[in-house]
């Protein structure tokens, strides 16, 4: 998934914990039917709730018409709940998880791509804690 950013956008440091939203795919665990597994819809990375994840790969910025975009090197989050729900509804077994960028972590503001015109406010972060499911289909 890509994050469109303004040409002059820079990473900021979180002065406090910041709440955003992550869309994940949710599947039942075959060995424990009341437990679910979660994975990222684009990269297919399995994640666990209440655990911190850090992106160690360098963020690579590329040109895209009138803006730039970051393809990898950040963890993508939605800036608002309604946009996350809309994307979860378009994702196989989609759900929305409350995601916290921990104080002191780097993040960059941008827009979700492939949304038409890169118009859905989104965030790219180097660190995140997935807290709990706040929406499921």
Model-predicted segments: where are they?
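Conserved NAD+-utilizing ADP-ribose enzyme module
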Residues: 1-75, 81-137
């Amino acid at each position: 998934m890509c994050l469109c950013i303004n040409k002059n956008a820079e990473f900021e440091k979180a002065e406090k914990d910041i709440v955003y939203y992550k869309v994940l795919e949710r599947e039942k665990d075959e060995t424990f039917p009341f437990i679910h597994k979660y994975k990222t819809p684009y990269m297919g990375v399995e994640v666990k709730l209440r655990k911190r994840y850090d992106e160690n790969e360098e963020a690579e910025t590329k040109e895209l018409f009138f803006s730039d975009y970051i393809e990898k090197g950040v963890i993508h989050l939605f800036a608002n709940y309604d946009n996350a729900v809309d994307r979860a509804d378009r994702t196989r077994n989609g759900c929305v998880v409350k995601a916290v960028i921990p104080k002191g972590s780097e993040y960059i503001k941008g827009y979700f791509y492939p949304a038409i015109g890169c118009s859905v406010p989104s965030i790219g972060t180097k660190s995140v804690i997935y807290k709990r499911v706040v929406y499921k289909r």
